[in-house]
Each structure stands twice: as C-alpha cells, then as structure tokens.
UniProtKB/Swiss-Prot annotation:
Lineage: Eukaryota, Metazoa, Chordata, Craniata, Vertebrata
Record's compositionally biased regions (Basic and acidic residues): 703-718
Biased composition (Low complexity): 729-775
GO CC annotations on file: nucleoplasm; protein phosphatase 4 complex
Pfam families (alphabetical): EVH1_PP4R3, PP4R3
Alphabetic keyword roster: Phosphoprotein
Sequence similarity: Belongs to the SMEK family.
GO MF annotations, alphabetized: protein phosphatase activator activity
GO terms, biological process: DNA damage response; regulation of double-strand break repair
Physiological role: Regulatory subunit of serine/threonine-protein phosphatase 4.
Protein name per Swiss-Prot or TrEMBL: Serine/threonine-protein phosphatase 4 regulatory subunit 3
Ranges for region Disordered: 670-818
Regions of compositional bias (Acidic residues) in chain numbering: 670-681, 788-803
Amino acid sequence: MTDTRRRVKVYTLNEDRQWDDRGTGHVSSAYVERLKGMSLLVRAESDGSLLLESKINPNTAYQKQQDTLIVWSEAENYDLALSFQEKAGCDEIWEKICQVQGKDPSVDITQELIDESEEERFDDMSSPGLELPPCELSRLEEVAELVASSLPSPLRREKLALALENEGYIRKLLELFRVCEDLENREGLHHLYDIIKGIFLLNRTALFEVMFSEECIMDVIGCLEFDPSLPQPRRHREFLTTTARFKEVIPISDPELRQKIHQTYRVQYIQDMVLPTPSVFEENMLSTLHSFIFFNKVEIVGMLQDDEKFLTELFAQLTDEATDDDKRHELVNFLKEFCAFSQTLQPQNRDAFFKTLSNMGILQALEVILGMDDVQVRGAATDIFSYLVEYNPSMVREFVMQESQQNDDDILLINLIIEHMICDTDPELGGAVQLMGLLRTLVDPENMLATANKTEKTEFLSFFYKHCMHVLSAPLLANTTEEKPSKDDFQTCQLLALIVELLTFCVEHHTYHIKNYIINKDILRRVLVLTASQHAFLALCALRFMRKIIGLKDEFYNRYIMRNFLFEPVVKAFLNNGSRYNLINSAIIEMFEYVRVEDVKSLTAHIIENYWKGLEDVDYVQTFKGLKLRYEQQRERQDNPKLDSMRSILRNHRFRRDARTLEDEEEMWFNTDEEDLEDGEAVVPPSDKMKNDEDLMDPISKFMERKKLKDSEEKEVLTGKASLSGRQSPSFKLSFSSSPKASLSSPPTASLHPGSPGSPSSPGTGARSSPPSAAVTTKGGLVGLVDYPDDDEEDEDEEDADSKEESPPLSKKSKLSS
C-alpha cells in the first residue's frame, strides 16, 4: 500500500455551505480504545499531527462521490469530506466503512439518518424496494407523483434513488423528453420538469454523474426549461450553445480537462440560472450539488497549474506585442476567470497557485496589459491585480521596487494603477474606489514585513514617496493653485476626496516620509483650498486631513501651520458657513475644541492672536471663549513665572512621599545631615509658601491684586522691625545672602530659572532688597502650618528638582507663543 493511495485532504463544511480545507495527510483505519470502535485516522503529512479522528458510527450515512470522495455528517450541521488522491485508496477506505456497517461496498451511500416515527420506519423497512412505473408517456404523471411523494421521507428517497440508478431510468426519461419536445406535448414536458427537479433534490452524486455527463446534460437543461408556472419556456440551451460558446484561447491538450471545464460551467449555470431558488427546506437537499461544483473547480485549477506548457504559452502570448487586441482580450478574460476559480481554494492551495503565477511572470504581464488603450482589457487586468494584492501585497511591493531600477517612473506598475484611478471614466468612480483600496493595502505598514536583513517598510515607503507620490497628488496640486478649486464638478471632487483620504491614511500610519512631503510641497495649504468647495463631502475630507495632523501634536507640523497661517481657510470656512448647524460647523468646532482641551499652547496663542476678532462673537459654544481663557492664562504665566512655581510647590506637597528617580545632585542634597538645617535655615521662604497656597485657591484674575496686598504687608512688617522668635536667629537672615549655607539652601539654578521658588530675582516677590524681610515676616506662620521644620527642607529640595525639570519647556513654549 503506497502513500499516494492513502493521501487525502480533509474538508469541513462551514456555515456558508463552503468547504474549508483542514489539511493534507494520510488516512488509515484502526480500533481506538477511547472511542470504543473502529475509527478513521488522518495524520498530517507535514508534522504527523492528528488531523482527524472519527469513529465509524453504525448509524452514520457515508456517501462516496466521484470515485475519490467520501462525505458524511459527524453531527448536526457538521459535514466532513475526505478527498483521495487516488481512486484505489478511496475504495479501500470505503470497503472498511461498509464492513463496519455491514453494507455492500458496491453502493455509494450506506444509509441515511431517519427522523420518522418508529411505526413508519418499520413499515418502510419491511416493505419491498420501490418499483418505478414503466417509462412511458402515459405514465409520466404517475412518475412525477411518485417522486414528489418520496421526497419527505429519507428512506423513500434512498429507495427511489437506488431504483433510478439501477434501472438506468434517467436516460429513459431524457429519451421521452426528446419525444415530447418533438410532439410539442406541453403536459408531458411539465411533468418531466417536476421529475427532473425532484431528482436534483434526491442529493445523490451517482445520479448527478449520469445527469451531468456529456450526452445527458443538455437534455437535463432542456427539461428544466419547461416550468409549469411560466407561460413560455426558457431558452437556456440556446444561450449555452450560441451566446456562451467555449473558446480555447490556448489549446488544451488534455481532453479530460476540457470536458471538466465544460461540465463545471454548465452545472454552475444550472445551479445559478436554471434551477428555481430553493426554499429553506430544499437548501440542504442541494448540498451535494454545491460539493460537486466545488471539487470540480479544485480539480480544474490543479490540472491547469500542473500544465506548465499551457501556462507558459498563456503568458508568452499575453506579453507578445504581435498578439492582436481581440486575442489579448480573450487571454486576459481567461486569466481573470482562472484567478476567480482560485478563490474556492483553501489558503495553502491558493499560496501554491499564486506562487506558480508569480514564477510565470504574471506581474510583468499585467504591467504590459495596463499600458494598453483597451478599457475592457485594463478592467480585467485590474481585477487580476486585486487578487494578487489581496493574496500577497509583499510580493507586489518587491516586484515594483525591483522594476524601479530598470524603468522610468511613468511605466512603473503602481504609477499605471494610479493613472487608471485618476482617469476613471465611470461617473461614480467605481474603478477608482477599488484601486484606491489596493493602494491603501500596499502602503499600509501593518502588513509589511521586517526581517533581520532588510525592513520592507523603510524600503518601500522610500520608493513610494520618491517615485509615486507626485503622480498621486498631481490632480490635487493642479486643482488648488488659487484660493478656490479650479474645477468643482462632482466627479473631480470625488477623485480629490479619494486622494485626500489616502493622504490622511498616510499621515496616520507613516512618519517622516509624509511629514517631509507635506511640509516641502505645502500640501496642507493645497488641501485646505478644498474647504471652499461647494461639495460638503470634499470640504469635510480637507478638514479631516488637518484634524489628523493637529491630532499628532507634532511641533514641526504646528510651526508649519503657524508660519503659513493655515488656520485662515478654516476660520473663513467656519464664518462662511454662518449659523448653519451642519457637519462642517461641528467638524471645525471640534478641531478648535481639541486644541483647547489638549492645551496645545503654540496653536492656542496663534489662533487667538490672529483670528480672535472673527471668533469672539461666537457664543453658542464656549470653545472660543475657552481658548481665549487658555491664552490669557498662558500669558499670565509668562508675565508671572512664579505662578508655575506655585503649582509645582502644591504638587510637591501632595506627592512628596512618592518614589522618584533622583539625579546625583538631588541624592547628595537629601543625604545631607538634617541637623545642619535645624538652626532656622529655610529652603523656601515661608512667606512665599503661605502666599502660594493661598493664591492658587483664588481665581487667577485676582492674583495681581493679592500680590500687591502681600507686598504692602511685607513692607509694613519690615518698617516695624518685628521681633523674632528664638528660632528666628540672625543666622537665618544671613542664610539668604552671605553665609556659605545660603548657597546650599537656595536653589542652585536660581540664576538660570528666574521663576524658581525662593530666588531673590523672582518677579512678583517684591523689591529685590526685600527677601530677608519676607523671611522674617512669615517664619512664625511656617511653624503654625507645618509640624516639622525638616519637612520644609525636603519640600524645598523637591521644588528645586521640579523647577529644573519644568522651567526649560515653559520657557520654550513661551517663545513659541510670543
């Protein structure tokens, strides 16, 4: 027993009534102790894993189809199939199944599950086999009634199928059909329609093989033309013999393959066009017909794939300049149908199929075809290209990068695709939408590979932006040279919307490539011209593009927007929209609201300083007033850097016990002996600390008023020379100005960061000569608020660290805002 005889594919039927390939392996039968019976075992040929372990159940109905298939149901709605490479292997396993069930191996079905009552079951089993009436014109009505009455009962269906098969009854019926048609016997033809339709519902492969044979299939189709419910018969045979004539674009040397193609086309036609739409109850009775077509297609693709001579000739003629247009049109359509057939294959089979086409040069052939003027040929080539991109985008990327080294940009495959998208003549741009989807798949980094030797993402995106992006953006740049789109018709706007949507996708998924392109080519300005379009969908596309850029919170983009005043067309579109409450209104408000909520300082300042006059009267939302408040708070912090320091002090008080990563200087500071600080030296002037806590509880608008009040109080205390407590020693005064400890206690970066707490030069703390008096004034207050003086030393240290971390970004943002 050779391996090939037992080599099988395991299939399961999914919810869509399509067969899923579960793998290839070798089948055997053996007794399985766990299952308590003889079982079918399939082990994968790749790794020996168990693909199938199925007990041969005495009550399960097994069917043998097309000599190499065994089909059965494991449970409700769970069908299995074994497809054998060789008929001999199928026969061996079939004999084993029949042996376990005690059946004759000559039958093609062992039994059917029965859902009738026990009484009906025993009546049927005890009755003799079903006897068919003589096949005569006068008995056709009786035959039709017999078929109709047998369909509800599984056992009667089985007996009817066996009788039809054993007596060669179908061929006799088809002879009567020819007689009735010659005699124009309409009543007999109607009975034959009912009989043949009923035979389809018997769901038997053996009967289908007779009906779909070369000598019978056209007569079967003829019987189904005479539907009693229609006043006139259909003309299916006329269509199949004249309109749908078979053309061998490349001669097929294998007669079996040619016959299989004919048969599959006609059976598919019967299923799709001839048979009436099955009812809910009839749908499951046609499962064998679905399986027949499916396995035929698998067989055809396999036979063509193995015929290297055929495929070599096909691609040679496709790319040959001497091939005339009609011939090339036929070749492309054949290749399209060939690829469509491959969609019935399972993933591993489809991989092998497309790998074969790739090795034969399918992408080179498509490049030639897409450069032709024939619209139909290009359309078919586009469909083939879509199959390839969906199957393996990396294969397509690798090809286009290789060809870029040899060809000009104009004839690159991707640029040809882009040009077809731009030149789509369909008013609804159906082809352009399809091609844009393919481009998106190709430039999507999510399906790009990264290996140790090369990064596909980097290489392909560099190629795309260098060789293809200018072709894609050409219609956009050509149409946005003025303040309004030069062409604003519906079809042009649809195309521009597709282009902008792809650019938006690039902004989201690409990094420096798209950033450099947008800034160097001033793409955002051009896109925002589209906000003046009369078509709202295009204006919204432009707004989405800008919103995606702002959402990145990238200062390169922000500076580009501010430098070129790119909020101007947005504000103009908002004001031109007036009081209309629509998507444009909402989209623009949401954009400004995002800037406010995310506190994008540079854009906030830019918007208020340049566009506030146009927006200040908008009061039906608080977005713009909120932006103005943000701006004023920002200016307040610039004018009073101490305000940021206050916030950091409160934050340090609240979170000072949290674990933090400290720099070396901070570690040294915390490791200093705390006794050195117990003599009254304060890390932060206590008066400042009290004042900070109090100020932050009040609105910022009252800050200056309170500051003046505090300053006046400090001056009064200084003038009055208030007495000091025991802890308020002269050394405390010196610690701020001249003692060696003062340099340790005061923030070491005070000169670099004027806004640091405790710095003598901090704005808003009074005159430059007043810090000692401030310290004297509020030392007593410090003792009342904080229990332990050494806590203050820790607080001051954390304030210093925080000011180091926060001050540089604040000063940078201030420069952007000014």
